[in-house]
Amino acid sequence: MPATTPFLWFDGTAEEAARLYVSLFPNSTIDEVMGTPGSAMGVRFTLDGAPFIALNGGPMYQFTPAISFQIACADQAEVDHYWEGLTAGGGEPGQCGWLKDRFGLSWQVNPAQLGSYLGGSDAAGAARAQQAMLGMGKLVIGDLRRAYEGEA
């Protein structure tokens, strides 16, 4: 199967965005800056082993929430790390673990176990967890677990 690489269109902030993302994710690197650093045409970078390309394409296209990147976090510390890092500097918190970073790119910052709470064998617990999630911006694993278990 051919390799697939997300190609992200920015309006002059490709290098800044790539540097932010690389600073937040482990096993991440700036692989190539195409053009002059500081006014790059594009940036090839790797986020936790996955290749990406960012292009300074101009104002013609904007990101929408119809496309987002999901981060499956192992624990609350990871949720907090990505949430704080991606909303810093003008990002916008959203509902149910969604956010928009300061470049307009949408992310879902979710605990890895979210699916087991929302789709677990206990239908009433799943409904409680979903209701709890609907009231959250940043997801709080302990609150989701307590809702699922009927302790909230």
Feature annotation, model-predicted:
Residues F25-T29, G90, G137, Y148:
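Sec/Tat-exported extracytoplasmic proteins
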Residues T4-D11, A14-E15, M41-T46, M60-S106, N110-L114, G120, ...:
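Vicinal oxygen chelate
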Residues F7, L47-D48, Q113-S116, A123-A126, ...:
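Conserved "turn/edge" positions that cap or connect secondary-structure elements
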Residues P6, Y21, F45, L86, ...:
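Terminal peptide-recognition signature
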Residues L8-A50:
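Core segments of cupin and vicinal oxygen chelate
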Residues S121-A152:
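C-terminal cap/linker of serine protease catalytic domains
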